[in-house]
Amino acid sequence: MEIAICLLTTEPNHLEEWLDHHINKGFKDFIIFRDRFDFLYGEKYQNVNIIDEYIETPNEVRFQMDLYLKVCKKHKYDYILFIDSDEYLELSEEYSSIQDFIEKFKEKHSNFDGIGINWRMYGNNDIIKTRNSVDSYIKYYRDDHIKTLVDPSKVKIFMDPHLPILNNKSHILNEKGEKITTPIKTHSSNSIWIKHLWTRSLEEWKIKVQRRGWYQFYDRKMEQFYEYNNKCIDI
């Protein structure tokens, strides 16, 4: 089974940690688009396949969705996961890798072409200014938005970066085997989830507030940092 993970990112400081995390989850193929920054891949990545491209993105909201569709048309993988640099795939302890999860999912659900994976939104652990490692973030709240692991050959178009529209008779399921038709699905994250480091530090939130273009669908405000953090609890 060939599974890739696709990333469009503006954030060089996240990339090494993001790569290491997903290699640990079983990913061996990466499709990475670096928006206006250089990155030197070290020798530790010589055993994984990284398709890497430097790009300068236009100031257009649709750019990300159009890029995702091009990736689906160009690359022949069984599945591709489309996530961002502040998002990290997580699995419960019963699964050794993403491959293991999909194989066991197939034993329960035979008719699917993608899996919608809910967000867990993590706050900054009350350490406002310091950016910590991924594993140190433990407080979160459940969010109904999803990101998608999908068979690229079945994708018709992306109208939203969270969920593609598939060809006729193709289906995306959540972890419980329920069909997903919108980018928001009642939260379920017992076996698989996206660890979304939404308010990782105050400094990084300031950058999110200032962003415009493909990565910004709506205006953010500084006070939202504290609003989101206050929703995060130990679960």
Q: Where do the model's predicted regions map?
A:
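Active-site-proximal specificity loops/subdomain of glycosyltransferases
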Residues: D38-I83, E90-E93
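Catalytic-site signature of metal-activated, phosphate-bearing donor transferases
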Residues: V61-L69, L91-I235
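A structural signal for isolated positions on well-ordered beta-strands in alpha/beta enzyme cores
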Residues: A4-C6, F30-I31, N49
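N-proximal low-complexity "stem/linker" segments adjacent to membrane-targeting elements
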Residues: M1-I23
